[in-house]
Amino acid sequence: MIKTRLARGGFSHRFIIKNMRYPVTLEPVEEGGYFVSFPDIPEALTQGDTREEALEMALDALITAFEFYFEDNEKIPLPGPVGQDYVDVPLSVASKVLMLNAFLDSKLTQIELANRMGVKKQEVTRIFDLRHSTKIDTVGKVASAIGHQLTLSIE
């Protein structure tokens, strides 16, 4: 099991994600196939001809919905309890979700974050782009700059 945690030093403000899994609802469609929705992320909707295809499409729909939260500077709801069906979010995306939520809690602007990190604002813009590959060390630097600590463990 891989665990990702973004903790705020001195506070009990912790985000612990063990395999960030978002529950999905698969509904059979009269014409055939399945309609997919996420109870925690209502914007993420998709469908597939088969159950397997629907679940494959679900991850892309979820990440696309996350992108809207990033663009709008809104916190991303964390996953609720998982039932029968779920989608595992890649750790690279999960770490950015936690990073965005903690950044928004900090009330800093991206310019202030860039200044604290000693980088240009364009670099911070790239960091907050889900489709841009960001090194985990960079996520750790963001965490530090906003008064948090990124902790990874393998159990």
UniProtKB/Swiss-Prot annotation:
It comes from the Bacteria. Residues 99-153 form the HTH cro/C1-type domain. The keyword Repressor applies. Disulfide bonds: none annotated. Signal peptide: none annotated. One of its GO terms (molecular function) is DNA binding. Keywords: DNA-binding, Repressor, Stress response, Toxin-antitoxin system, Transcription, Transcription regulation. Residues 110-129 bind DNA. InterPro entries: Cro/C1-type_HTH, HicB-like, Lambda_DNA-bd_dom_sf, TA_system_antitoxin, TTHA1013/TTHA0281-like. Belongs to the HicB antitoxin family. Antitoxin component of a type II toxin-antitoxin (TA) system. Functions as an mRNA interferase antitoxin preventing effects of the HicA 1 toxin. Probably forms a complex with the probable mRNA interferase HicA1 (its cognate toxin); when complexed with HicA 1 inhibits the toxin activity. This is Antitoxin HicB 1. It comes from Photorhabdus laumondii subsp. laumondii (strain DSM 15139 / CIP 105565 / TT01). The gene is hicB1.
